[in-house]
Amino acid sequence: MRKNRILALFVLSLGLLSFMVTPVSAASKGNLLSPDRILTVAHRGASGYVPEHTILSYETAQKMKADFIELDLQMTKDGKLIVMHDEKLDRTTNGMGWVKDHTLADIKKLDAGSWFNEAYPEKAKPQYVGLKVPTLEEVLDRFGKHANYYIETKSPDTYPGMEEKLIASLQKHKLLGKHSKPGQVIIQSFSKESLVKVHQLQPNLPTVQLLEAKQMASMTDAALEEIKTYAVGAGPDYKALNQENVRMIRSHGLLLHPYTVNNEADMHRLLDWGVTGVFTNYPDLFHKVKKGY
Protein backbone atom coordinates (compact mmCIF):
# COMPACT_ATOMS: atom_id res chain seq x y z
CA MET A 1 0.00 0.00 0.00
CA ARG A 2 2.80 2.37 0.86
CA LYS A 3 4.47 1.45 -2.47
CA ASN A 4 1.29 2.33 -4.37
CA ARG A 5 1.15 5.72 -2.71
CA ILE A 6 4.82 6.42 -3.31
CA LEU A 7 4.33 5.64 -7.00
CA ALA A 8 1.31 7.94 -7.18
CA LEU A 9 3.22 10.76 -5.50
CA PHE A 10 6.19 10.27 -7.83
CA VAL A 11 3.92 10.67 -10.85
CA LEU A 12 2.64 13.91 -9.32
CA SER A 13 6.01 15.31 -8.32
CA LEU A 14 6.36 17.87 -11.11
CA GLY A 15 2.89 19.25 -10.46
CA LEU A 16 3.47 19.45 -6.75
CA LEU A 17 6.43 21.76 -7.25
CA SER A 18 3.88 24.44 -8.07
CA PHE A 19 2.48 24.09 -4.56
CA MET A 20 5.22 26.46 -3.46
CA VAL A 21 3.41 29.34 -5.15
CA THR A 22 -0.14 28.79 -3.93
CA PRO A 23 -1.80 31.80 -2.23
CA VAL A 24 -0.95 30.32 1.17
CA SER A 25 2.37 28.46 1.17
CA ALA A 26 1.94 24.93 2.49
CA ALA A 27 5.11 23.15 1.56
CA SER A 28 7.29 23.52 4.63
CA LYS A 29 8.06 20.25 6.35
CA GLY A 30 5.99 19.72 9.49
CA ASN A 31 3.33 22.19 8.37
CA LEU A 32 -0.19 20.82 8.78
CA LEU A 33 -0.76 21.80 5.15
CA SER A 34 2.28 20.03 3.76
CA PRO A 35 1.36 17.67 0.90
CA ASP A 36 3.43 15.06 2.72
CA ARG A 37 0.96 15.01 5.62
CA ILE A 38 -2.12 12.77 5.70
CA LEU A 39 -4.80 14.51 7.76
CA THR A 40 -7.60 12.97 9.77
CA VAL A 41 -10.52 15.40 9.83
CA ALA A 42 -13.18 14.45 12.38
CA HIS A 43 -16.41 15.06 10.45
CA ARG A 44 -18.73 16.93 12.83
CA GLY A 45 -16.48 15.54 15.56
CA ALA A 46 -16.42 11.81 16.24
CA SER A 47 -19.95 11.71 14.86
CA GLY A 48 -19.98 7.96 14.27
CA TYR A 49 -19.92 7.48 18.03
CA VAL A 50 -21.30 10.64 19.65
CA PRO A 51 -24.03 13.17 18.72
CA GLU A 52 -22.57 15.40 16.01
CA HIS A 53 -21.37 18.93 16.61
CA THR A 54 -21.39 18.71 20.39
CA ILE A 55 -18.50 19.50 22.72
CA LEU A 56 -18.45 15.81 23.67
CA SER A 57 -18.13 14.84 20.00
CA TYR A 58 -15.08 17.09 19.64
CA GLU A 59 -13.54 15.85 22.89
CA THR A 60 -13.96 12.28 21.67
CA ALA A 61 -12.34 13.15 18.34
CA GLN A 62 -9.36 14.64 20.17
CA LYS A 63 -8.94 11.43 22.16
CA MET A 64 -9.03 9.50 18.86
CA LYS A 65 -6.06 11.55 17.60
CA ALA A 66 -7.92 13.50 14.93
CA ASP A 67 -5.74 16.16 13.32
CA PHE A 68 -8.71 18.51 12.88
CA ILE A 69 -12.20 18.87 14.28
CA GLU A 70 -14.77 20.03 11.75
CA LEU A 71 -17.22 22.81 12.59
CA ASP A 72 -20.24 23.73 10.44
CA LEU A 73 -21.50 27.24 11.14
CA GLN A 74 -25.04 28.62 11.17
CA MET A 75 -26.17 32.02 12.47
CA THR A 76 -29.03 32.71 14.88
CA LYS A 77 -31.70 35.41 14.63
CA ASP A 78 -29.63 37.61 16.95
CA GLY A 79 -26.43 37.16 14.94
CA LYS A 80 -24.60 34.51 16.99
CA LEU A 81 -22.57 31.80 15.26
CA ILE A 82 -23.52 28.30 16.37
CA VAL A 83 -22.12 24.94 15.35
CA MET A 84 -24.71 22.87 13.49
CA HIS A 85 -24.81 21.16 10.11
CA ASP A 86 -28.40 21.79 9.07
CA GLU A 87 -30.10 25.12 8.46
CA LYS A 88 -33.09 23.69 10.32
CA LEU A 89 -33.26 22.49 13.92
CA ASP A 90 -35.48 19.49 13.30
CA ARG A 91 -33.01 16.64 12.63
CA THR A 92 -30.56 16.99 15.51
CA THR A 93 -32.60 18.71 18.23
CA ASN A 94 -36.09 18.62 19.70
CA GLY A 95 -36.75 22.03 18.14
CA MET A 96 -38.35 22.93 14.84
CA GLY A 97 -37.80 25.49 12.12
CA TRP A 98 -34.93 27.50 10.71
CA VAL A 99 -31.91 28.42 12.80
CA LYS A 100 -32.11 31.98 11.46
CA ASP A 101 -35.58 32.39 12.97
CA HIS A 102 -34.48 31.52 16.53
CA THR A 103 -32.39 33.43 19.05
CA LEU A 104 -29.40 31.85 20.75
CA ALA A 105 -31.38 31.76 24.00
CA ASP A 106 -34.08 29.72 22.24
CA ILE A 107 -31.57 27.28 20.80
CA LYS A 108 -29.76 26.84 24.12
CA LYS A 109 -32.96 25.37 25.56
CA LEU A 110 -32.90 22.49 23.06
CA ASP A 111 -31.70 18.90 23.49
CA ALA A 112 -29.04 18.14 20.87
CA GLY A 113 -28.26 14.59 21.99
CA SER A 114 -31.40 12.49 22.43
CA TRP A 115 -31.98 12.18 18.68
CA PHE A 116 -28.75 10.16 18.44
CA ASN A 117 -29.95 7.63 21.00
CA GLU A 118 -33.17 7.20 19.05
CA ALA A 119 -31.47 6.95 15.65
CA TYR A 120 -28.68 4.62 16.82
CA PRO A 121 -29.95 2.60 19.80
CA GLU A 122 -26.91 0.32 19.63
CA LYS A 123 -24.72 3.37 20.36
CA ALA A 124 -27.06 5.09 22.83
CA LYS A 125 -25.70 6.40 26.13
CA PRO A 126 -27.49 8.21 28.97
CA GLN A 127 -24.99 11.09 28.94
CA TYR A 128 -26.07 12.05 25.43
CA VAL A 129 -29.47 13.16 26.67
CA GLY A 130 -29.59 16.93 27.07
CA LEU A 131 -26.38 17.80 25.24
CA LYS A 132 -26.46 21.39 24.04
CA VAL A 133 -25.82 23.10 20.71
CA PRO A 134 -22.46 24.88 21.12
CA THR A 135 -21.60 28.33 19.87
CA LEU A 136 -18.40 28.92 17.94
CA GLU A 137 -17.16 30.91 20.92
CA GLU A 138 -17.79 27.99 23.29
CA VAL A 139 -15.83 25.58 21.09
CA LEU A 140 -12.90 27.98 20.78
CA ASP A 141 -13.01 28.68 24.53
CA ARG A 142 -12.99 24.95 25.29
CA PHE A 143 -10.15 23.88 22.98
CA GLY A 144 -8.22 27.07 22.27
CA LYS A 145 -4.81 26.38 20.77
CA HIS A 146 -5.04 22.70 21.72
CA ALA A 147 -7.05 21.82 18.62
CA ASN A 148 -6.92 22.42 14.89
CA TYR A 149 -10.14 23.65 13.30
CA TYR A 150 -11.64 22.89 9.89
CA ILE A 151 -14.55 25.34 9.70
CA GLU A 152 -17.29 25.45 7.07
CA THR A 153 -19.25 28.58 6.27
CA LYS A 154 -22.69 27.07 5.69
CA SER A 155 -25.27 28.95 3.59
CA PRO A 156 -23.35 32.25 3.56
CA ASP A 157 -26.01 33.81 1.32
CA THR A 158 -28.50 33.28 4.15
CA TYR A 159 -26.16 34.76 6.74
CA PRO A 160 -24.58 38.03 5.52
CA GLY A 161 -21.58 39.00 7.60
CA MET A 162 -20.79 35.43 8.68
CA GLU A 163 -17.22 35.62 7.41
CA GLU A 164 -16.43 38.81 9.33
CA LYS A 165 -17.87 37.38 12.55
CA LEU A 166 -15.87 34.18 12.10
CA ILE A 167 -12.60 36.03 11.55
CA ALA A 168 -13.27 38.28 14.54
CA SER A 169 -13.71 35.20 16.76
CA LEU A 170 -10.51 33.63 15.45
CA GLN A 171 -8.62 36.86 16.11
CA LYS A 172 -10.06 37.10 19.61
CA HIS A 173 -8.76 33.60 20.40
CA LYS A 174 -5.36 34.32 18.79
CA LEU A 175 -5.84 31.66 16.14
CA LEU A 176 -4.68 33.79 13.23
CA GLY A 177 -1.32 35.09 12.07
CA LYS A 178 1.78 34.99 14.24
CA HIS A 179 -0.21 33.81 17.25
CA SER A 180 -1.11 30.45 15.65
CA LYS A 181 0.76 27.61 14.01
CA PRO A 182 0.56 27.36 10.20
CA GLY A 183 -2.60 25.60 9.12
CA GLN A 184 -4.21 25.53 12.56
CA VAL A 185 -7.43 26.85 11.04
CA ILE A 186 -8.79 25.97 7.59
CA ILE A 187 -11.96 27.51 6.16
CA GLN A 188 -14.02 25.44 3.74
CA SER A 189 -17.21 26.12 1.81
CA PHE A 190 -19.22 25.09 -1.22
CA SER A 191 -19.55 28.83 -1.86
CA LYS A 192 -16.72 30.23 -3.97
CA GLU A 193 -17.88 33.73 -3.06
CA SER A 194 -17.54 33.02 0.65
CA LEU A 195 -14.02 31.63 0.26
CA VAL A 196 -12.92 34.53 -1.95
CA LYS A 197 -14.22 36.90 0.71
CA VAL A 198 -12.29 35.08 3.44
CA HIS A 199 -9.17 35.12 1.27
CA GLN A 200 -9.54 38.86 0.71
CA LEU A 201 -10.05 39.54 4.42
CA GLN A 202 -7.26 37.21 5.57
CA PRO A 203 -4.94 36.23 2.68
CA ASN A 204 -2.90 33.89 4.89
CA LEU A 205 -5.90 31.96 6.18
CA PRO A 206 -6.06 28.70 4.18
CA THR A 207 -9.29 27.88 2.37
CA VAL A 208 -10.57 24.71 0.73
CA GLN A 209 -13.18 24.59 -2.02
CA LEU A 210 -15.81 21.92 -1.40
CA LEU A 211 -17.06 20.18 -4.54
CA GLU A 212 -20.22 18.22 -5.24
CA ALA A 213 -20.13 15.06 -7.35
CA LYS A 214 -21.66 16.82 -10.36
CA GLN A 215 -18.90 19.42 -10.26
CA MET A 216 -16.26 16.70 -10.29
CA ALA A 217 -17.90 15.11 -13.32
CA SER A 218 -17.15 18.21 -15.40
CA MET A 219 -13.92 19.32 -13.70
CA THR A 220 -11.31 20.94 -15.93
CA ASP A 221 -7.72 22.06 -15.55
CA ALA A 222 -8.86 25.65 -15.98
CA ALA A 223 -11.36 25.30 -13.12
CA LEU A 224 -8.67 23.88 -10.84
CA GLU A 225 -6.35 26.75 -11.69
CA GLU A 226 -9.15 29.15 -10.77
CA ILE A 227 -9.62 27.40 -7.40
CA LYS A 228 -5.90 27.71 -6.81
CA THR A 229 -6.11 31.52 -6.91
CA TYR A 230 -7.96 31.59 -3.57
CA ALA A 231 -7.66 28.10 -2.03
CA VAL A 232 -4.97 25.60 -1.04
CA GLY A 233 -7.13 22.55 -1.59
CA ALA A 234 -10.26 20.84 -2.83
CA GLY A 235 -12.79 18.83 -0.85
CA PRO A 236 -14.84 16.64 -3.20
CA ASP A 237 -17.40 13.94 -2.53
CA TYR A 238 -15.19 10.84 -2.31
CA LYS A 239 -17.64 8.82 -4.42
CA ALA A 240 -16.84 11.08 -7.39
CA LEU A 241 -13.11 10.36 -7.24
CA ASN A 242 -11.06 8.00 -9.33
CA GLN A 243 -7.34 7.58 -9.85
CA GLU A 244 -7.35 9.91 -12.85
CA ASN A 245 -9.10 12.89 -11.27
CA VAL A 246 -7.12 12.50 -8.05
CA ARG A 247 -3.99 12.78 -10.15
CA MET A 248 -5.41 15.81 -11.96
CA ILE A 249 -6.26 17.68 -8.75
CA ARG A 250 -2.94 16.92 -7.11
CA SER A 251 -1.01 17.88 -10.27
CA HIS A 252 -2.28 21.42 -9.78
CA GLY A 253 -0.63 21.55 -6.37
CA LEU A 254 -3.89 21.38 -4.46
CA LEU A 255 -4.41 19.43 -1.26
CA LEU A 256 -7.18 16.86 -1.54
CA HIS A 257 -9.47 16.12 1.42
CA PRO A 258 -12.55 14.14 0.26
CA TYR A 259 -15.70 13.71 2.34
CA THR A 260 -17.11 11.58 4.04
CA VAL A 261 -15.09 8.36 4.13
CA ASN A 262 -16.24 5.80 6.69
CA ASN A 263 -15.33 2.48 5.08
CA GLU A 264 -11.87 1.01 5.60
CA ALA A 265 -11.57 -0.29 2.03
CA ASP A 266 -12.41 3.17 0.67
CA MET A 267 -9.79 4.71 2.94
CA HIS A 268 -7.10 2.39 1.60
CA ARG A 269 -8.08 2.99 -2.01
CA LEU A 270 -8.08 6.77 -1.66
CA LEU A 271 -4.72 6.77 0.11
CA ASP A 272 -3.25 4.58 -2.63
CA TRP A 273 -4.43 7.13 -5.18
CA GLY A 274 -2.75 9.97 -3.30
CA VAL A 275 -5.30 11.96 -1.29
CA THR A 276 -3.81 14.07 1.50
CA GLY A 277 -6.49 13.39 4.11
CA VAL A 278 -10.16 12.55 4.56
CA PHE A 279 -13.23 13.64 6.45
CA THR A 280 -14.56 10.73 8.48
CA ASN A 281 -17.10 10.01 11.20
CA TYR A 282 -14.61 7.45 12.58
CA PRO A 283 -11.32 9.27 13.21
CA ASP A 284 -9.91 6.35 15.17
CA LEU A 285 -10.33 4.05 12.16
CA PHE A 286 -8.63 6.39 9.71
CA HIS A 287 -5.84 7.11 12.20
CA LYS A 288 -5.14 3.37 12.25
CA VAL A 289 -5.37 2.96 8.48
CA LYS A 290 -3.06 5.84 7.59
CA LYS A 291 -0.25 4.42 9.71
CA GLY A 292 0.40 2.03 6.81
CA TYR A 293 1.23 4.95 4.54
Swiss-Prot record:
Induction: Transcriptionally regulated by PhoP.
Organism, as annotated: Bacillus subtilis (strain 168)
Summary of the knockout phenotype: Deletion mutant retains WTA and ceases growth upon phosphate limitation. Mutants show altered cell morphologies and effects on autolytic activity and antibiotic susceptibilities that, unexpectedly, also occur in phosphate-replete conditions.
Name of one Pfam family that matches: GDPD
GO BP terms in the entry: cell wall organization; glycerol metabolic process; lipid metabolic process
E.C. code: 3.1.4.46
GO molecular function: glycerophosphodiester phosphodiesterase activity; metal ion binding
Cofactor: Ca(2+)
The protein's enzyme class: hydrolase
Gene3D superfamilies (UniProt xref): Phosphatidylinositol (PI) phosphodiesterase
Name of the protein in question: Glycerophosphodiester phosphodiesterase
Main localization of the protein described in the UniProt heading: secreted
Enzyme active site: 43 (proton acceptor), 85 (proton donor)
Positions bound to Ca(2+): 70, 72, 152
